[in-house]
From Swiss-Prot:
InterPro entries noted in UniProt: NADH_DH_suC, NADH_quin_OxRdtase_su_C/D-like, NADH_UbQ_OxRdtase_30kDa_su, NADH_UbQ_OxRdtase_CS
Lineage of origin: Eukaryota, Metazoa, Ecdysozoa, Arthropoda, Hexapoda
EC number in record: 7.1.1.2
Primary site of residence: mitochondrion
Organism: Drosophila melanogaster
Record-level GO cellular component terms: mitochondrial inner membrane; mitochondrion; respiratory chain complex I
Family: Belongs to the complex I 30 kDa subunit family.
NCBIfam families, sorted: NuoC_fam (TIGR01961), PRK06074.1-5 (NF004733)
Alphabetic keyword roster: Electron transport, Mitochondrion, NAD, Oxidoreductase, Respiratory chain, Transit peptide, Translocase, Transport, Ubiquinone
Catalytic EC class: translocase
GO biological process terms, semicolon-separated: mitochondrial electron transport, NADH to ubiquinone; reactive oxygen species metabolic process
Claim: Electron transport is one of the keywords in the record: yes
Note: Upon mitochondrial dysfunction, the translation of the mRNA occurring on the mitochondrial surface is impaired and amino acids non-coded by the RNA template are added to the C-terminal of the protein. The C-terminal extended proteins aggregates in the cytosol and are toxic. The phenomenon is called mitochondrial-stress induced translational termination impairment and protein carboxyl terminal extension (MISTERMINATE).
Protein name, as recorded: NADH dehydrogenase [ubiquinone] iron-sulfur protein 3, mitochondrial
Keyword Cytoplasm: no
Length: 265
């Protein structure tokens, strides 16, 4: 009797071990299907290319809309450029109020004036564009404020809001001839004493009007009218190898932020 029990137990153990190594038909079919299914290639990550963040775009749009609602007298347009860069276009008389609002408002705190740039577009009625680049360290955010003027209309100086605007506005006055009212020390900063004209204007010749040289006889630097060794040539021509032909007479594409937020579905 004991031998019979041992024999039955051995057979049951052998059957259990063999059952573990048997792959059912359904499992083999699934294995074959999984091995033949095409695998989608992974997208290459380019660390040098910054992809726009949808959440950041939404927050910037909401903030630009909020600024336009708070300052409807000065804000003329709000737009997003390069995917997620906020620009606020304002009237010339709104430079100081808008910059003061962006600096002092608790939800903005754009206390750092990074730079002020000038742009000359002669085909416009107001040919000069002045761009204020602001940084908020509190919220790790940037914003651009743009305004416009012409050769005769001055802009209010931003020195009373940002002390860093002093030299930036002097540079724009020197290069473009944009006058800033109430500036504490508006004089040239890059060109030489007695320089005439503004070099960054589009109608200023590349060769200039005068030249400075050291005179061995007079033992000093003299300023004389420019003498060209060849006939003056005009280089303002379109070329087939120009890298950015679309931006010659057009602005970069921008996405306008509507005054009202889109309804949520």
């Amino acid at each position: 009797m004991a031998a019979l029990i041992r024999n039955l137990g051995a057979r049951a153990a052998v059957a259990a071990l063999s059952a573990k190594h048997v792959v059912p038909a359904a499992g083999s079919t699934a294995l074959r299907m999984a091995s033949t299914t095409p695998v989608e290639p992974k997208k290459a990550d380019k660390p040098t290319v910054r992809q726009p963040d949808a959440v950041a775009r939404s927050h910037l749009s909401d903030f630009g809309r909020y600024v336009a609602e708070c300052l409807p007298k000065y804000v003329q347009k709000v737009q997003l450029t390069a995917g997620d860069e906020l620009e606020v276009l304002i009237a010339p008389e709104g430079v100081v109020p808008v910059l003061q609002f962006l600096k002092d408002h608790h939800q903005a705190q754009f206390t750092n004036l990074v730079d002020i740039a000038g742009v000359d577009v002669p085909c416009r009625k107001n040919r000069f564009e002045v761009v204020y680049n602001l940084l908020s360290l509190r919220y790790n955010s940037r914003i651009r404020v743009k305004t416009y003027t012409d050769e005769l209309t001055p802009l209010d100086s931003a020195c009373e809001v940002h002390k860093a605007a002093n030299w930036y506005e002097r540079e724009i006055w020197d290069m473009y001839g944009v006058f800033f009212a109430n500036h504490p020390d508006l004089r040239r900063i890059l060109t030489d004493y007695g320089f005439e004209g503004h070099p960054q204007r589009r109608d200023f010749p590349l060769s200039g009007y005068v030249e400075l040289r050291y005179d061995d006889e007079k033992k000093r630097v003299v300023c004389e009218p420019l003498e060209l060794a060849q006939e003056f040539r005009k280089f303002d021509l379109s070329a087939p190898w120009e890298q950015f032909p679309n931006f010659r007479n057009a602005n970069p594409p921008a996405e306008v932020v509507p005054p009202q937020a889109p309804a949520k579905k």
